[in-house]
Amino acid sequence: MNPIVAAASVVSAGLAVGLAAIGPGMGQGTAAGYAVEGIARQPEAEGKIRGALLLSFAFMESLTIYGLVVALALLFANPFAS
């Protein structure tokens, strides 16, 4: 394998995981804050808010998992290496 391609793959894998975690991390923090605020305003809606929050957490976390899959593909099944 070309050393430049190997180095670029490692850097790209690191960036893929790092950048894929930034957005969902910020989104989860914002969503949790608004969920706590909503539960404080309407305690009787706690179950619905919590269910919607957990579902949205799953969708947000899937973006991070996709970044991890791309990083693993770049490291171990690199399509750019000959």
From Swiss-Prot:
A GO cellular component annotation in the UniProt record: proton-transporting two-sector ATPase complex, proton-transporting domain
Transmembrane segments: 3-23, 57-77
Stated family: Belongs to the ATPase C chain family.
Domain of life: Eukaryota
SUPFAM superfamilies in the record: F1F0 ATP synthase subunit C (SSF81333)
Keyword set includes Plastid: yes
Name of the gene this protein is made from: atpH
Protein name: ATP synthase subunit c, chloroplastic
Family matches, as NCBIfam families: ATP_synt_c, PRK07354.1
CDD domains on file: ATP-synt_Fo_c_ATPH (cd18183)
Reported function: F(1)F(0) ATP synthase produces ATP from ADP in the presence of a proton or sodium gradient. F-type ATPases consist of two structural domains, F(1) containing the extramembraneous catalytic core and F(0) containing the membrane proton channel, linked together by a central stalk and a peripheral stalk. During catalysis, ATP synthesis in the catalytic domain of F(1) is coupled via a rotary mechanism of the central stalk subunits to proton translocation.
Other facts noted in the record for this chain: In plastids the F-type ATPase is also known as CF(1)CF(0).
GO MF, one annotated term: proton-transporting ATP synthase activity, rotational mechanism
Residues under site feature: Reversibly protonated during proton transport: E61
Pfam families documented for this protein: ATP-synt_C
Membrane topology label: Multi-pass membrane protein
Major place of residence: plastid
Keywords of this entry: ATP synthesis, CF(0), Chloroplast, Hydrogen ion transport, Ion transport, Lipid-binding, Membrane, Plastid, Thylakoid, Transmembrane, Transmembrane helix, Transport
The protein's assembly and partners: F-type ATPases have 2 components, F(1) - the catalytic core - and F(0) - the membrane proton channel. F(1) has five subunits: alpha(3), beta(3), gamma(1), delta(1), epsilon(1). F(0) has four main subunits: a(1), b(1), b'(1) and c(10-14). The alpha and beta chains form an alternating ring which encloses part of the gamma chain. F(1) is attached to F(0) by a central stalk formed by the gamma and epsilon chains, while a peripheral stalk is formed by the delta, b and b' chains.
Localisation: Plastid, Chloroplast thylakoid membrane
